[in-house]
Amino acid sequence: MPFTLPREEQDGQARTQAERTARAETKMVLAAIDLLNTVGIQGTTLVAIGEKSGYSRGLATHHFGSKAGLFRTVLKRLSAAWSKQLNQQLDGKTGLEAVGIAIDAHLAHALKHPEYIRVQYILWGAAIDPASKFKPNAAEFMQIQRESVAAWIRGGQANGEIRQDIDPEHSAEHYYGGLIGIDHQWQVSPDFDLPAAYSDFKRNFLHMLRAT
């Protein structure tokens, strides 16, 4: 699970207000993730979230302000958890090694937590709506991901393993666009071979980057 509930009460001691607040928010975010996976955006209401998480609609409204506020929080929590996980695996690496590790990590995360990937795509799709109030969250996450990839490519260029004629920013766009496209096809095609698609993408992308 990308994030867990704060610790339970121990030794009969009551949780602090901050712990209760964090626990309530996490329970409601997890409820929203479950609802988005089962009934979609229309069915993921503050009332439904309150009922599923064991809280009231009033508390959900207090925490998130609105349905859009809830979706912003869901995206932030999923994005932050993924970024933390990826950074731990990268451990400061750069260049071709970092690109390969990141592609493998994306695949492992998708296979382990398909429900979280599905929620991200549901909300990213909804963010295209001109009236969407959480479009900036989706755009910010994607920009951060592209900037990370561009930094790995520049690191590889600095140590001579990546071609100097490669544009880091444009290559990062191709990288992230490729992974989004692969995952999107997987979401809508039950027979789509995700590991094979990732393997091909990894081989081709690294070949395109590698200095000869």
Name the predicted role of every residue range.
Residues 1-23:
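N-terminal intrinsically disordered/low-complexity leader segments
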Residues 80-83, 87-88, 112, 132-159, ...:
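Amphipathic alpha-helical packing segments from all-alpha helical-bundle domains
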